[in-house]
């Protein structure tokens, strides 16, 4: 086949036409021969330059684009690089770059029961456990943005529950305070009043029991002394000399009153006016006598009242009233 191509006549074209004709066998004999020669020369001169520029461009483009067969020593294949990037963004993959350890608070005696999860590195979990802020904290892996969002939502829900509990506690405290003001305060006041009444009755009952218990027993020293004082007061009240002294004081008071009336009559008979008044000496004597008698009367009155009071107390202690019939 190649020999036949080489022995093809010089005037015949690729499709069997003469060189004098066109590409589809058309005749070119009518064109001048002088015009065809310069055109052929220009095409022959421009063809090498165009071919050389295309070769240079293909070499530059081939050097910049990746070819499947051309691999370097420091560059991984594109599918492997894409898979590596996807693994770093995947929160469920061990090679995820967006991960850290947070801490949850638990009971201290339950800390040994916790351990790393299925997608966690035990070594990293142990390192996080050593860096825990307190003995009752455990590390929890948080990888990717979904884990952070889930933890924030959980914290927000827990805070909302705590706020609801606080509102319930405040409402309960308000109700307790209101009930205390309306009910317990009144009950406490009534109980205090009843306590005072019962204390008074218990004291009175204890005094009566003590008197009944000591009846028939010998008196103590204080009781004997009090008895002697009461007997002396009773004797003083019943002493005839005391009555005679009272009669003497009354008589002296009557005499003094008569003396004052006599002085008044004498002043009126002598024509002394009220504007002149009594003499200073007479007024002083009369005033002194009246003051002395008044002091004596007050002293006697005070002694009588004290004796009467002591006698009533003694009578209450030694003659208690009979208990009321039930």
Swiss-Prot record:
One of its GO terms (molecular function) is structural constituent of nuclear pore. One of its GO terms (cellular component) is nuclear membrane. Contains FG repeats. FG repeats are interaction sites for karyopherins (importins, exportins) and form probably an affinity gradient, guiding the transport proteins unidirectionally with their cargo through the NPC. FG repeat regions are highly flexible and lack ordered secondary structure. The overall conservation of FG repeats regarding exact sequence, spacing, and repeat unit length is limited. This is Nucleoporin NUP57. Belongs to the nucleoporin GLFG family. It is found in: Nucleus, Nuclear pore complex; Nucleus membrane. Its main location: nucleus. The gene is NUP57. Residues 25-52 have a biased composition (Low complexity). GO terms for biological process: mRNA transport; NLS-bearing protein import into nucleus; nuclear pore organization; protein localization to nuclear inner membrane. Residues 1-10 have a biased composition (Polar residues). Residues 1-52 are annotated as: Disordered. It is a peripheral membrane protein. Transmembrane segments: none annotated. Pfam families: Nup54, Nup54_57_C. GLFG repeats lie at residues 22-25. SLFG repeats lie at residues 13-17. Residues 218-239, 280-321 form a coiled coil.
